[in-house]
Design a protein with these regions (language model features):
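Non-transmembrane, aqueous-exposed alpha-helical and coiled segments at domain scale
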Residues: 5-187
Length: 187
């Protein structure tokens, strides 16, 4: 963290440390809880955090507070990101570099909530099917697609078979299974 008057320090990034950041670091100056419509995004990887979350953050900084962003970790490997974001009040720093090498740090505050599907898939389905959810977006890397060796959809993949077998209290575990469960609930 670049702290005002102290240079680089190892202070944790949290909502309470934002006022102590160096003025060169852009910080969210809006009510992070505000927003009556929401975007639920599955797959909160680096691409999402550097693009969609940044765009939503910039809109909110400009006073457009209608939209809030909920992130969803779908895979077990997303646990590390969930833990890191939880320790930082769902804040993170995005550093961009201009063609001339100038760096710009910005704390992104658009992520109002992070849900972790492996532990609470029903919370994810609740968010996806909520009336205030207007947009469901996702970024899935090639490893997240349920394909066979030829790149074709594989109805026999472990995740697809688990989703198809889900019944009653069982919740799907794949991104598409979660979206389908939410769509069925919204009917």
């Amino acid at each position: 963290v670049l702290e005002r008057g102290r240079g680089m320090t190892s202070k944790a990034l949290t909502a309470s440390t934002l006022p102590r950041l160096d003025p060169s670091v852009a910080v969210p100056g809006y009510d992070r809880r505000a927003g009556e419509q929401q975007i639920v995004h599955l797959g909160v990887g680096g691409f999402h955090r550097a693009h969609l979350a940044q765009y939503v953050d910039r809109l909110r900084c400009a006073g457009e507070l209608r939209w809030r962003l909920i992130g969803v970790g779908v895979l077990e490997q997303d646990r590390a990101l969930r833990d890191a974001l939880a320790g930082q009040d769902n804040l993170y720093t995005l550093v961009t570099v201009d063609p001339d090498g100038a760096e710009h740090a910005r704390v992104i505050g658009a992520l109002s909530q992070y849900l972790f599907a492996p532990e609470d898939p029903q919370a994810v389905i609740d968010a996806l099917s909520a009336p205030q959810t207007r947009i469901i977006s996702m970024t899935i890397t090639e490893g997240g697609y349920e394909t066979d060796g030829a790149g074709e959809f594989s109805p026999r993949s472990r995740a697809v078979l688990a989703d198809l077998a889900a019944d009653g209290d069982d919740a799907p575990g794949s991104a598409l299974g979660l979206v389908i469960a939410a769509l069925q609930r919204r009917r």
